[in-house]
Curated annotation (Swiss-Prot):
Keywords carried by this UniProt record: Amidation, Neuropeptide, Secreted
Highest taxon listed in the record's lineage: Eukaryota
One of the protein's GO biological processes: neuropeptide signaling pathway
Primary residence: secreted
The protein's name in its UniProt record: CalliMIRFamide-1
Family stated for the protein in its record: Belongs to the FARP (FMRFamide related peptide) family.
Species annotation: Calliphora vomitoria (Blue bottle fly)
Length: 12
């Protein structure tokens, strides 16, 4: 997720 500030929360 390049445009996501909290990328470590979008790891599924």
């Amino acid at each position: 997720a390049p445009n996501q500030p909290s990328d470590n929360m979008i790891r599924f």
